[in-house]
Amino acid sequence: MNCNRRTLLKTAATLIVLPAAGAAKAVSVCPATDITIPPEKDLISSFGWVTDVHYSVQPVRRIDNEDSTRVYAHSLAKLRQATDLFNTRKLDFVIELGDFKDCKDDGDREGTLEFLRTVEREFSRYNGPRYHVAGNHDFDKITYEDFVTNVTNPGDANGKSYYSFVRGGVKYIVLDACYKDTKGNHYSEGNFNWVQTYVPDEELAWFKKELATGSEPIIVFTHQNLNYWDKGPMNNWFIKNAADVVSAMEQSGRVLAALSGHYHRGWYSVRNGIHYVVNQGLVERAPPRNVFGIVHVGRDHTVYVEGFYNERSHVCKPAKA
């Protein structure tokens, strides 16, 4: 496998991991991508992403009906592999798309908080702005306040689970769908059924105002999935009122793409000019498998999803005017 101009200069044949709690070490191999990224002068924004790290200290868990094999012991090392690469690139920020931590079935609040603090310390090795998206597992055993006070977002986004920011000529909007209903009852301490997921009325009204403010192209981040028309294996993973969110996005005429995690196998869909990229879960399976990526937005508003290792790459063309 040959390294091109956008891969790490440092390569090795293997990924070395230390599964002990709080320990992580990774030697990066040459990542594989299968798309051509335009030169920097033709890009207006670039950012790195990871999703579904599910950091915790517990045995491998197999979930047959999801074809899921969650190898928690390697999550920190795989995250380090991502941040090591991100630190070699010129990025506007990095973002994790939810389910940052997990918990033990017999765990407690303090132990679960330590998982969150540990994975946040690892993520903070990235030398730049870092953002977080709320995922359902982020509220196992801990409260909403526990989560937002133990992760750090830049500036006005700190302490919030939904927010917007502008970087590099692109507006980014983060939504929180970890609500049990549209009235605003948030997940907390495991008091929820993960398939019941909503963007509440108050947040949806805020979202519509954000879509109408400014003139930049927009990328939306969620943990749970919006592509509700893709019936089949993903049915339990959709936001229940996704149709309302998607309608607002389509009416705005500004949204280029929506990125999410949650469905660990990944998915891609496009509807009415908006691209829906569901990224694969980092926790799945043992090294050398890993999944993370970098997104680049071109001056022509093409979105390039540069997948590394086992993650897929996409070229998302903007809708024709």
List the predicted regions and their residue ranges.
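Residue-level marker for buried hydrophobic side chains located in beta-strands
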Residues: 47-49, 94-96, 132, 220, ...
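Alpha/beta-hydrolase fold active-site loops
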Residues: 45, 92, 162, 170, ...
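Extended active-site neighborhood of metal-dependent phosphoesterases/phosphodiesterases
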Residues: 30-41, 65-69, 105-213, 244-255, ...
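N-terminal active-site segment of His-dependent metallophosphoesterases
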Residues: 27-110
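Short acidic, glycine-rich surface-loop motifs adjacent to enzyme active sites
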Residues: 214-229
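N-terminal secretory signal peptides and thylakoid transit peptides that target proteins
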Residues: 1-19
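Short active-site segment of divalent metal-dependent hydrolases/proteases
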Residues: 55, 102, 138, 226, ...
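Active-site glycine-centered loops adjacent to acidic/histidine catalytic or metal-binding residues
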Residues: 52, 98-99, 135-136, 223, ...
